């Protein structure tokens, strides 16, 4: 890359990549339905045992090589360089993800507009019908919103690491926290807040079962943007003498904190109106919450707009991180300018995004293997490419890279028994855990 992050810029950029839309609609619901703080404790343990371990492996690849994923594997492999370089192409998964991710952010833009104009639905059935119409029949709105988000995301990446990605995250991540804190202050005054606290934090170990352990294991891996080259790419711009162990723990903490703050805000309103939090996924936000915000009146419109804007912030910081790995690769390998690289990537992302829209419309509906094109991209990226990329990164660092090179990198920040423990987890425990998640995802 042409420039490096500042120390705080690196933390906020990677945290921005990790903090995504799932923090609002997946993580809080899983916590509440799976044992509250018992699930949180399980999630933290698995994050440190799996996510943290593989995160440091990918960080090591990026920091030592200072290359994009493809060239990083090729540079560091002592033999079979070409074969290992192909592992770097798991960054294609990031391109697939950003194609439908920008579309979902576009949906949120639509709901910001509905909030501001006071046109959110007042009834759950109406809300379901409105959202269903929007994604299955309203091509024009989806096209406009998707295009706006697409242009915004690619403009930010075009500015580079320092002036684009870092500036975005240095501004957007604190803004996200400010919005969440303001919404939390308002939520505290509501009767539903106590129920939300109990739902999220009162431990119920009886709810911990094999299914929940697998869910927590999956979250521990996927919530850190592993397996698609993002961490390798960002770490190539990690400033020297940065305590990356502390930085990684800070990133994990920020990700967890945003999820819990989102959960408190979301479920305060869910419980305030006597709803049952049985939805997980976009429906929780676009159907349940949209209805509740409208019921509150003018304050609800303001609150709804603030909430949806906070989701846009979380989504854009993640989307930006997914474009950078392939951009960096094209610049490194073919000597392209950043502008030309982004035009090529942009064409692919835009076509895939438009296909996602068309595959869900009633008039142009199509799919593969019983799934819409949208769901296919989601499944291929999250169930195949991401876990495969993480497993191969762990194997590469644990069995292919020289241990002495890792010791030198880690020496100022983690040594002795702690380094050896991380190394054992990296070689044997963490990859096996991800294999289990991968198998469980297919069986599900």
Model region roles, listed by residue range:
Residues 6-46, 232-235, 245-249, 253-256:
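Transmembrane helix-boundary motif of multi-pass solute transporters/channels
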Residues 2-3, 9-10, 17, 143-144, ...:
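Loop-to-transmembrane helix boundary motifs in multi-pass membrane proteins
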Residues 2-4, 8, 166, 170-316, ...:
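Membrane-embedded translocation segments of transport machinery
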Residues 29-34, 69-89, 102-162, 194-214, ...:
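Inter-helical loop and helix-membrane interface segments of multi-pass membrane transporters/permeases
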Residues 101-123, 177-200, 268, 352-360, ...:
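Hydrophobic alpha-helical segments and their helix-loop junctions in multi-pass secondary transporters
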């Amino acid at each position: 890359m042409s420039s490096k992050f500042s120390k705080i810029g690196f933390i906020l950029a990677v945290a921005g990549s990790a903090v995504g839309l799932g923090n609002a609609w997946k993580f809080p619901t899983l916590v509440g339905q799976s044992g509250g703080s018992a699930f949180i404790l399980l999630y933290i343990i698995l994050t440190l045992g799996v996510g943290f371990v593989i995160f440091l492996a990918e960080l090591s690849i990026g920091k030592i090589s200072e290359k994009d994923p493809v060239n990083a594997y090729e540079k560091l492999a002592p033999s079979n360089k070409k074969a290992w370089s192909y592992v770097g192409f798991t960054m294609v998964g990031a391109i697939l993800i950003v194609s439908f991710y920008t579309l979902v952010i576009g949906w949120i833009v639509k709901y910001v507009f509905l909030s501001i104009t006071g046109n959110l639905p007042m009834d759950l059935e109406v809300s379901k019908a409105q959202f269903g119409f929007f994604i299955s029949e309203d091509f024009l709105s989806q096209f406009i919103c998707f295009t706006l988000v697409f242009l915004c995301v690619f403009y930010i990446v075009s500015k580079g690491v320092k002036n684009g990605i870092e500036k975005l995250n240095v501004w957007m991540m604190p803004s996200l926290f400010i919005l969440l804190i303001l919404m939390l202050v308002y939520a505290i005054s509501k009767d539903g807040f106590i129920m939300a606290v109990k739902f999220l934090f009162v431990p119920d170990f009886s709810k911990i079962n094999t299914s929940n352990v697998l869910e927590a294991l999956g979250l521990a891996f996927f919530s850190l943007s592993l397996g698609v080259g993002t961490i390798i790419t960002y770490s190539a711009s990690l400033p020297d003498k940065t305590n990356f162990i502390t930085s990684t723990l800070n990133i994990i903490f920020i990700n967890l904190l945003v999820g819990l703050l989102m959960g408190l805000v979301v479920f305060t309103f869910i419980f305030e109106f006597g709803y049952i939090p049985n939805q997980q996924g976009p429906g929780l936000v676009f159907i349940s919450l949209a209805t509740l915000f409208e019921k509150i009146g003018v304050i609800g419109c303001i609150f709804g707009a603030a909430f949806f804007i906070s989701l846009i912030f979380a989504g854009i910081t993640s989307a930006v991180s997914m474009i950078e790995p392939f951009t960096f690769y094209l610049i490194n390998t073919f000597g392209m300018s950043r502008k030309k690289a982004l035009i090529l990537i942009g064409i692919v992302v835009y076509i895939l995004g438009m296909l996602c829209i068309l595959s869900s419309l009633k008039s142009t509906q199509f799919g593969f293997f019983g799934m819409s094109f949208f769901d296919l991209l989601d499944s291929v990226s999250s169930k195949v490419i991401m876990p495969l990329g993480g497993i191969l990164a762990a194997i590469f660092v644990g069995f292919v890279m020289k241990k002495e090179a890792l010791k030198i990198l880690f020496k100022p920040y983690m040594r002795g028994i702690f380094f050896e423990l991380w190394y054992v987890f990296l070689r044997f425990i963490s990859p096996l855990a991800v294999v289990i998640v991968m198998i469980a995802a297919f069986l599900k």
